[in-house]
Structure formats: structure tokens, C-alpha cells
Amino acid sequence: MGKTKSRGRRAEKKEAEKELLQNAQSLAGENDSKVSQPSNIPNTFFGLVDSTEIEYFKQAESTLNINAFETDEERNGFISSVLEEAQGKELKLVTNQICSKLMERLILFADSSQLKAIFETFSGHFASLAFHKYSSHVLETFLVRAAALIELELTQTDEDYNEGHGEERDKDYNEEQERRQKVQEQSLSEKKSVEEMFLNMVNELKPYLSTMIDHQYASHVLRLLILILAGKELPSTTTSNSTLRSKKSKIARKMIEIKDNEDFDRAYQTPPSFKNELREYIQIITKDLDTKRARELSIHKVASPVLQLIIRVEGLVDRERTLWHLVFAKQSEEKVPEEESFVEYLLSDSVGSHFFEGIIKNDGARPQYIERLYKLYMKDRVLKLARRATTGVYIIQALMFKLKPVEVEYILDIIIPELANLISIADNQNLDLARRIVDASIIRGNYRRDDIIQQLFLKFAPNYDLSNPQSSTSTEFLENALQLTGSTLGNTRDDWPTAEERRRALFLEKLMELDYRFIICAWLNFMALPVERFVQMCMHGVFSHVVENALVVEKDEPKNVQILRKRFLNIFQGNIVTLACNSYGSHIVDKLWNFTVFLPMYKDRVALELMGEATKVKDSNYGKLVWKNWGMELFARKKYDWKLLIKAQENEFLGVDEDTERPLKPIELKMNNLARERKEQQERAEQAQMGYNKRKLDELTGNGEKRQKVRGRRRE
């Protein structure tokens, strides 16, 4: 009898887990044989949080997350009570997966005295916290708050400092001896400045710097410390391009809804002592490095960002640029074989290219250093590097904004004729290159702008006739640029727009900013779409921005373009209310107010559609805003005033003030003449009436009798 085959999902899952475990063990064995675990990584155990404590702190974290406090005082009182409950347990809380989130929230909301107390608790254990998976994140948040406190201490006067700290020192002075002793100890701890505490922590971490460089968690703490010591901007922990956290950490923070406070995304004033500490940090890190080890770290997945940062800031304290000259050779006009091999690896490796791009973009390296590497190893193969869509092309993009103008124009001269071939629509490659080419051209005074436009039309709308655009009935421009087929457009499952869709939409918006011909091409493509498909675009989270950015009117609009604009506006007819009540579509309806300038009939059509379903529009949160922005109350009650709004918009578009005279149209001249004649007739009628009234008055009062003329000089 054959072997019985196990069936069912559980059995399959069990087999899969077993296979994964075996693979992981074999991989771990290989890694252990290659890399030995550093012996100086602290691994202090601070204890476990029991189940009852976890429940309490978990509930407290949830309460802070909801933030349902009526006042700040109520929230501060809650934070004080939680900190009091956590007193003496802080270290085991920050190393716990659940409770570390609570400690991070408490640090974000804590006041200066509470932060100082936490600082004292962490003192002596910073190394252990920096190397731990969970506490390292808490420590990063804590360091940002500490940097803000240091700046506060530097900027406030002694009177402010004493006013904020003296009361607590003196309030229990006359109580029993034990209480007095406690207050005095607290007073002494408060006298210690945050700068002193911070420097103690910096010294505590010095023995571990070489290990922190390539450690999965401690390296992030080290990067943040270097930024603070150098007085550089401390980036957000959630933005996609942040240098503060790893990609996984940024995603996790968004999922658990931990938001940064106002202390992030800014630089802080630092005391002079920090420059000395930064110099010592860099000396400790570089003293045991040789060229081979420095290059290994620069292409190490974890250590590479640390070395990028050191190269960026070492010029502040080291005129010799020690680390730069460890990684790259000294200034020379000839190629160095070992350096040439290393640069070639940087240009072809994903981690290496990130490192190379970073040191070019940042202001740390001297321009002559970058120019030397470019001329020796890259200038003669710019096009070849631009074809490396995942590595070398990013180096070329960075160089276009760092080299001298003549070198930038040389790169543009090589790439622009091949731009259409370099962009891959199917693989979504080199769209960023096209954007950077456009930016570099604009900076250089629209250098070869027409050639760039021709190449972009050749790639994204090859059948579009620039000389006769109205003959186009294709949607190839939108399809090639946005890849509508297979996108989330029209999905009923509430799918989030993808990152690729965002990149493509931003690229198309860049094209429309570059030249108005891309906008006209977009109009024609919108009109070629089925109306239902176009309405779906207007209500899509990403593609709606493309439609919105296409609603642009030129100052000196030719007649044929105005006719095309009218045709484009016709496809909105019958869908205005639907769009007005949608979160994305409402922005488009708002934009139609400006897009219908000099087309009052189309304005009336939109307003009539909104008026026809006024109740539905007003009941919608988004519709209310559209109703207000279109001045619909005036349309409903004071049509004449609404027309004045339209007139004011037209004058503003033309740049004509109300006091500035402009050439009048024939109909306006005729109306002015009629008004003048009517005014003159009215004045003559008023004068005649006044004469008649005067004569009547004279007759009634007897003043109308003729006076006898008296001749001679004396007529009394």
C-alpha cells in the first residue's frame, strides 16, 4: 500500500512552517559561521511586566491614543498619574513590546520636570536601551525631546529658570527631616541641567560607538545623536524620506498611530560643548578604520546611512575630512585602480548607489571631490549609467544638481536625444529621470526645452499630431502615462491607490506644468474616454489630481483652444452634483469656477445643476463647500450680485483693477452713450420743472408784479 498523503490546510501549513524553520536554521548557521556576534553589546535584563500591570498600562496607552480629554489639564493629570504608577518600572516598560508604546506617548506629552525624572532613570542604562529592539525607538523619541529642552535652557534667562524651579524646592522646607531630605535630593537633581545629563549619556555611549555603527537598532540612535550634536534638522519619524527611522519602523508608527509633536522636523540651538563631543565621536569611529573597512561599511545595509551622515557633518569639526579620504582616494588627476573598482561597485549595487547618491546630494562633500569622481569614473559613460534603471541612473540625477553648469549641459546633451528610449512605460522605469531632466532644464534657463517636449510626446503620445491636435481621438497619452488599465480606477472594493499610481500621476502633472500642449493633449484624451470612466477618474484618490491640474486657462487663449475648452466642459454636464458630493470630485467642481472664466453660459449650467438638487448638495459635507465657493446663495437670491462676481473674476484674470480704464467694447460704448443722453434729458427736465415751480411761487406771493423802471443814477 502506498504512503498515505496528509490532506487539509492545517497539515499543509504545518509542513510549510517546518520547512521555513529548517531554512531559517540553516541560514542562521551560515551567518554564525561567517559573522561572530560582537562581545561588547550590552544585554541587560530589566525584568518582566506581570499580566496585571500589562493590562493597566495597555489601557492607559489606549486612553492616550484616543485622546478624549476635554482639556490639556485633564490630560496632564492623567499623564502624571500614569508616570507615578510607572515609577521604578520604567526600564522594564520600555523593553516590553506593548508598554514601550505607552512610554513613547508619555515622553511626547511629558513636561520638562517629568522628562528630567525619566532622564535620571535611564542614566547608566542608555547603552542597553540603544541596542534593544523596543527601547531604542523610545530612546529616539526621548532624545528629540531632550534636544528641545536643551535649546529652551540656552534661550531662557536665569530669572525664568529660578521662577520655574524655586517653588518646588522651598515648599516643604519646614516639614519633618525625612521629607526635607527628599526635597533636597530632588532639588539637586533639578539643578543639574539637561545639557549635563545629555553629555553624561554621550560619554556613556562612547565605548560602544564602533558596535553601534552596524547594529540593527543602535545605529538609528547613533544617527540621531550625531544630528543633535551637529545641530542639524531632526526629521519626522513617519515621513517616507525620513532618515530617522527604518522603513518598517515608519510603517509601524503609522499603524499604531503615534504622531510626532512640534519638536520634530526642525533643528535646535546647541551649546559649544556639543561640537567637541561631535569631534570626539568622529575620531572614535574613524581611528580604528582603514580604507578596506570603511568601504565595507559604506556598502553595508545598516552602516551605510551612518557613514553618509558622518561624511555630511564631519566638515564642521574636521577640515581634513578624514572619513571621506578613507573611503575615497586623495585628490589626484589620475585614476586609482582600487578606487575605480570600488566606484564601479557603488554604481551597480543597490546599497552602494544609495550611499553614493546620498553623499552627492548632501552638502558635506566638497564640490571638487564630487567633480573629481565624476570626471575620472563617470563622464565618459553617462548614457551607459543612465540605462541602469535601479542604480546608476540615480547617481546621474544627483550629479545634475551638483556639478558646474557646463557639465550639467554636457549631461543633458547626451541624455535628452535618448530620453524616449531610456523611459520604460511597462516597467515603470526612469520616470524620475525625466522629471529631473525637466527640472535641470528649467534651472538652466529652459535649456533644450523643445527637444525635451518632443521626446516626451514621442514616448507617451507617439500618434499625437502637434500641428493639428484636434484630430486626436485617442487615449494613449493617459494610458501610457497613468496605466489606467489594471489600475485601481473603478474598483468597488475601496482599494487604496498604489505608490506607483501616485508616481505616475505626479509625473503627468509635471508634464502639464512644463508646457500647455500637454494640457490640451490631456483634454482630448479625457474627451475620448467614456464619460463613466472620466467620472471615475474625477472621484479617484490620485487621478482626480490629474483632472484638477488640467483645468487651466491661458491668458491669451486662441479661439480654437476656447472652443476645445467648451467641448471639454460638456462632458461634466449631468455629473456636477455627483462630483460636488464626493470628497475628491468636489475639488474639481470648485476648480470649474476659474476654468469657466469668460464662459458665463457654462457657469450658469453648473449653477443650475447645483440649484436643481440644492437639498442633496447642502446635505453633503463636501457639497456645502461647493455651494459656498460657487456663491450659490447669491445665484438663488441676488442674481445681479452673482453676475458682478463673474465680472470681478474676469477683471482679475485680465489683471485689470476697477479703477484702471480698459478699451470698451462697442456694446459698452453704445450703452454709455445712451446713459449719457438719458442723464442729459433728466437734467433738462429737472431744470424746466424748477423754473415752473419758481414762477408759480412768485404768482402766489405777489412777487410777480412788474417793477416800475426808475431812470437816472439815483434810483432809491
Swiss-Prot record:
Keywords assigned by UniProt, alphabetized: Nucleus, Repeat, Ribosome biogenesis, rRNA processing
Sequence ranges of Basic residues compositional bias: 1-11
Source superkingdom: Eukaryota
Pfam families the record matches: PUF_NOP9
Subcellular location: Nucleus, Nucleolus
One example of a Gene Ontology biological process annotation: endonucleolytic cleavage in ITS1 to separate SSU-rRNA from 5.8S rRNA and LSU-rRNA from tricistronic rRNA transcript (SSU-rRNA, 5.8S rRNA, LSU-rRNA)
Function recorded in the entry: RNA-binding nucleolar protein required for pre-rRNA processing. Involved in production of 18S rRNA and assembly of small ribosomal subunit.
Protein's recorded name: Nucleolar protein 9
